[in-house]
A protein has these predicted regions:
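Positively charged n-region of N-terminal signal peptides that target proteins for export
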Residues: 1-5
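Phosphate-group recognition and catalysis centered on beta-loop-alpha active-site segments
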Residues: 17-285
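N-terminal signal peptide c-region/cleavage motif recognized by signal peptidases
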Residues: 13-15
Length: 285
């Protein structure tokens, strides 16, 4: 009887500390050129459980995978993504700058894929889609994104994020998405700095939040004769987790988890997911 109770206790403890979902940041940017088909393939081989990808709109309105505001950052071309068609982008080498001076991915078919091609190639994989288009109209992005997700029957296996609240606000209700970064950051700031648990402004009872485990910010204080600015760090801890989870069903994903220590902290806090640059390293934690 004692051994049965001991085993049951271990099972309960194990369930309570279940490991968070391992999410490959930009397809696993630490192991291969970000947001490319080879990177996604490698990340899944390295046991990533979901893929985080970055999306912009091409000149012909096609959602494609690319993050920086200029093509010169990662490819052998210059200009904005929105200046080229999806077909033209598909011929560009997105592995051109990866790997320092050795450039091991040049000429290895690490091109700029369309979102539709990615979803069709991995029909069973969960994707987090990060909208980064610097010049796309939010309504247009929402419309084109919706078309692709419906065409590929992917609405049940995606969730959309953006650092710009306007892109989240423009999404139709049919597209699963995160609570805006602005609201998430403000809510965490109130807990971290003032120990106040701010009610959510979002309707419903199921919420997804995403933010860095530790986020450096500047606090602006206004005085009679001017303003004072002081640095501060927003940190997730038990108080923060309890607050977020006291208001409906909260799912929390931590960004920038790139060490065993941070992964352990995220696991102990009960994070639902962690975003890592290198699934190859993360699978050893």
């Amino acid at each position: 009887m004692k051994s049965i109770l001991t085993a049951l206790g271990l099972l309960i403890a194990s369930s309570a500390c279940a490991a968070p979902q391992l999410i490959a940041h930009r397809g696993g940017t630490g192991d291969a050129p970000e947001n490319t088909l080879p990177a996604i393939k490698l990340a899944l081989e390295n046991k990533a459980e979901a893929i985080w990808i970055t999306v912009q709109l091409s000149h012909d309105g096609v959602p494609v995978l690319y993050r920086p505001s200029d093509l010169s950052v990662l490819t052998d071309h210059t200009g904005k993504v929105s200046s080229f068609s999806a077909a033209e982008l598909a011929r560009m080498d997105a592995g051109w700058k990866w790997g320092g001076e050795t450039h091991p991915w040049r000429g290895k078919n690490a091109t700029i894929p369309t979102l539709q091609s990615v979803l069709e190639q991995w029909p069973q994989t969960f994707f987090y889609i990060d909208i980064k288009s610097p010049d796309a109209d939010p309504a247009m992005m929402a419309s084109r994104l919706s078309e692709v997700l419906q065409t590929t029957h992917s609405l049940s296996r995606v969730r959309v994020y953006s650092t710009e609240d306007r892109y989240i606000a423009a999404l139709p209700e049919s597209i699963p998405h995160f609570v805006s970064r602005g609201e998430t950051r403000t809510k965490l700031a109130n807990i971290s700095l003032s120990h106040q648990c701010q009610p959510t402004t979002q309707p419903g009872d199921d919420y997804w939040y995403g933010l860095e485990l530790k986020r450096k910010v500047e606090i602006v204080e206004k005085f009679t004769l001017g303003e004072g600015v002081s640095p501060a760090t927003l940190t997730w801890d038990k108080e923060a987790m309890d607050c977020f989870r006291s208001q409906g069903k909260a799912h929390i994903v931590f960004f920038g988890i790139n060490s065993a220590d941070d992964f352990r902290t995220a696991s102990e806090l009960g994070a639902d997911g962690v975003m890592v640059d290198s699934p190859a390293k993360a699978k050893t934690w």
